[in-house]
Curated annotation (Swiss-Prot):
Low complexity composition bias: residue spans: 1-16
Organism listed in the record: Schizosaccharomyces pombe (strain 972 / ATCC 24843) (Fission yeast)
Name under which the protein is recorded: Uncharacterized protein C584.16c
Chain spans, region Disordered: 1-26
Amino acid sequence: MASSSSSSGSSSPASKRSSRKRQTPPMPELPSFLLAFPHAPPLGFLRPKLNSLVVQVKRQGITAEPVFNLYSRFSVHTLSHNLVLDNVSSESNKTSAVFCKRHVGSSQVVIKIYSPHIKDYLPWTISCTKNEWVFDMLASFSIENSLRIKWVAPDKAKLNETWKCYLHIQDVKKSYFLASLTSRSLQFEGGSVGLSNRIITHRELEMVILSTSLCVQLSLLNLLPNYFPKP
């Protein structure tokens, strides 16, 4: 009996180690962010400003330094100011989202996502109603790469103030809950979404969620009343 119990005890840790090795490692969790609006514009006239302010997005609970900046830049192609959201990492690894008009005089706003991973930008068109904001990436070259991000308004009857974000993958007709947005912070929940075979990577998905949430947030704060579409 003693030898039997000792042999089973010695084999158990090994079996646990082998089972752990066979498990697929989870995708990294996307962080929670805070939006910070500085009281004074940055020094120097060369730095672009958004309504005299640069909106800084800070990683919650980790560092007080901004990890994303949102600013405006004049576009000679559309004769309007584009909004640019980019991370503050090195230029070689920079991921950016540009909110821009499709062409001169257009009322349609497009979000273009740039990153080192993609050769061309990923365009997202915007539409909205009173209850939701919808962002469509319609990839004409492949239906597999057609995605929809939908932000659903909170249920005021339940005294809820949280917006919910969902990713709809068109070709497989699946929907994933991705993030929640309050007046103070954005919390990602997208760790279970598998995008390894698609054009958009996990890092770019982070930028898409962040940029779409900023559309909702800035509109709710009435900071850009004439820029984003009206319900």
